[in-house]
A protein has these predicted regions:
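Core active-site phosphate/anionic-ligand binding loop and the adjoining beta-turn-alpha structural block
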Residues: 1-31
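Short helix-coil junctions and helix-kink-helix linkers
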Residues: 19-54
Length: 169
């Protein structure tokens, strides 16, 4: 939804509810309502307008908390922010943008910047394997910026790999 707000396709909740009717999610909700927490399709709302409005409100609230959009609940308007544009263009998850928004400061050290980006949601499923620890230890000695954390933390592994990639060793 953030990308659609950035593109200008969506500027208010009414347009967002309408846009949602063109998605695969909507088709699946109609075909298999139980899977999406809809006990049965209400005869008074067969097109799930109420449910779509709930989803739009929840998504807009979440994006607003992450500072990716400005959401005026009373007027129903949605407006993109600089963070929303960045997230949309680079496919960054809202959880990562929220971490950046809350923790990125004007005068951070390189150590803290690498640590912050290594905490991105996109890297959360990267495992630490026992057979990698020796190699990571060798890398940690060669990276240009000191690494905070232990080799048992996925964020530390990501930090090391980011620096290794950037410094091309």
């Amino acid at each position: 939804m953030c990308a659609e707000i950035v593109l200008g396709t969506i500027s208010n909740t009414k347009e967002a509810v309408n846009w949602l009717s063109y998605t695969y999610l909507y088709v699946r909700m109609l075909r298999n309502p139980e899977l999406y927490g809809i006990s049965e399709i209400d005869k008074s709302d067969p097109m799930l307008v109420g449910r779509r409005h709930e989803l739009v409100h929840a998504a807009a609230t979440l994006l607003s908390r992450s500072n990716m959009v400005r959401y005026d609940k009373l007027a129903g308007t949605l407006q993109s922010t600089a963070l929303g544009k960045i997230a949309s263009h680079y496919y960054i998850k809202h959880q990562s943008m929220q971490v950046y928004s809350e923790n990125l400061k004007p005068h951070m050290s390189q150590i803290d910047i690498f640590r912050l980006f290594s905490l991105s949601k996109e890297f959360s499923l990267v495992p630490i394997r026992e057979n990698e620890k020796l190699e990571l230890q060798k890398f940690v000695e060669r990276v240009p910026v000191p690494v905070k954390g232990t080799l048992d933390e996925p964020a530390t592994k990501i930090n090391i790999l980011l620096q290794a990639y950037i410094s091309r060793f």
